[in-house]
Amino acid sequence: MAAAVVVDTVIGEITLAHVVVAFCLIQIYITVQIEYEKQQEEQLLQQRISIMISQIQPHFLYNVLTSIRALCRIDAREAESALTDFTLYLRGNLDSLSNTGCIPFLQELQHTKHYVDLEKMRFGRDLTVLFNTPVTQFSLPPLTLEPIVENAVRHGVMQRLQGGTVIISTSETESDFVVTVSDDGIGFDAEQLAAGGKHIGLWNVRERLAAVCGGHMEIESGIDKGTNVTMCIPKCRKESE
């Protein structure tokens, strides 16, 4: 009888020890997970800041303001419209810093159009931007479409003497919403993206797209062959949010 009591006591102590160990492991896991998520949020914030800074570099601000000043002498109404685009463009960049999730595609598209209007004011007929976006009812991280379009304009078509065309289109498959930005600019070697450099904005978009909504981005480009960038945003992510 005494032996049975001892065995029961030992079993009880072992069971309790297992519970304590399991509880400690759960606590450790939760702590590690919280720290990981905190680091992820900080990394995403730094990426958003990096993208925003790359978009509003001093030379870009100077060029836009100089163009608006010149426009004031010719067409005050057009100058007012350009100033509105510029203000909304800056506001969109700043608002993105406080947004850790996704925003409606139409909101990102409108932000992109403000940028496009500013560049068309500067480059005129040398820059053509076409929109083919029948699919719009989905969300994506802020500052994803606009940096891709900016890369196409700044490092693609406007590097050609005759300018060029950028095409923005949307579609969908059974599993993804698809956003494509194509240009007939000078193109680049894909290794330039891996190495960073002037295409670092594309790398940042790819990282944030994967981290925020589980999406992915594909890039096809070659010297003098233009560039095609495709973003895929999973539908299952949208349904689970």
Regions found by a protein language model. Give the residues of each.
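Juxtamembrane "helix-exit" motif on the non-cytosolic side of transmembrane helices
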Residues: 2-8
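Two-component histidine phosphotransfer core
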Residues: 8-56, 60-218, 230
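Generic C-terminal helix-cap and adjacent flexible tail
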Residues: 192, 235-241
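A short beta-strand-to-loop motif within the catalytic HATPase_c
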Residues: 219-223
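Short C-terminal beta-strand
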Residues: 227-236
